Amino acid sequence: MKKDIAVFGAGAAGMFVALAAQARGLSVALFEPHARTPNNFAISGGLFPAAGSRFQRASGIDDSPQAWLDDLRAFAPGMVNERIAQSVAEALPLATDFLVDGCAAPFRFLPDMIAPGHNRRRFHSIEPASGAAMHAWFRQAVQAQPAIAWFEALPQVRRQSRGFAVDGAQDVLEVDQLVLAGGGFGANAQMVERFIPGMAGALNNGSVTNDGSAMALGLQWGAQVWGMDGYQGQGHTNPGGATRLGMAIPSLGGILVNRQGQRFVAEDIGPSALAPRVLSQPGGVALEVFDAAIEAQLGNHWAYQQALAAGQVMSAGSVHELAAQAGVDAQALAQTLEQVAACSGGQIDPLGRRAFARSLSAPLKASWVTGALSHTQGGLLTDADGRVLLEDGQIMTGVFAAGGCAAGLSGRGADGYLPGNGLAQAFGLGWCLAQALG
């Protein structure tokens, strides 16, 4: 059996590339050995930036790919993967148009979504806004395309003088080009200990399918890697990892306190950078404190609604009642909220937080959170079109990569992850990659 390309991994990048490639008239074999297990795409927030999209313009938002790049470079100075950043920024509005116009994706702009590090509102998603809903739409879309053959098998591949032989279907497939689109290595304890020792043993709230296998195939062929210590942390994860609060609460005025009832971090540094800070506190936990007025703005936030339904959110009519429920020092918590009120009125925050949306008032809300590893940012280094690069900088013939197994947009540690980077790389680099195939 002959196909033009084989794609390993049916996450965001893999399914996007498959759709974009078939739209160019290419035949695709899409392999997903973990089809019955939720991948990172399915458990993500399902949010991606598309700076300069027509949907933003229709909402009166003045944005551009360059503005998003400026935000990325300011948020992660010296940590941006400049090989792909410009092309990804320019590709994201095109990728969004393709999904909506070419695939009838029910995507929409989220004018109320505020994210740390972004100076404009530029997030897009599906209705309802969740990774589960977006993943389900993509799965249905790829399986409806006759040019995309779907295989729930672990493929074995060998290089040939021209192209590749892929064994994972009923017959051995002959393909011209290979796209590695598997997950990262967040569920591979040995790789985490080697490359991100500070998160060794931390809660992994990413998919168990992130075993590093797609990356290993590229390494076997001499691929170069980049940013292997970079990762997306999640500082709003409820202990146990089944639910999380989402990233919006600090932007709306929420705070984090430790078991002593004291703030310990500027909460607006972003959800990723918060993860190691939360883990550094006693017990590796923090209490996220907000109020009913903030909760009222989270009706469309899927992650928060899941946590609320799971009983992870406390409600209290006063500071002392909340302190009693949470088991923190009431006097310290009251003093903390007084300090927050002063900062929201213009006083400089000693921890360096730049903005407090408002002071908090009863009825109060709170939830215990911990720091977790959501997904890794390092991976196979590519050029701007997703071609995998060898250790000497030359292009690896016929091999492309995008998604979790490929080098991300920015890294070192958790601080370089700008919210939305994961799906931005998957769709933006995926678009460039698909145009380069053939």
Name these PLM-found stretches:
Residues 151-163:
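A conserved short coil-to-beta-strand element within the FAD-binding core of flavoproteins
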Residues 215-217, 221-332:
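An anion/pyrophosphate-binding glycine-rich loop and adjacent beta-alpha core
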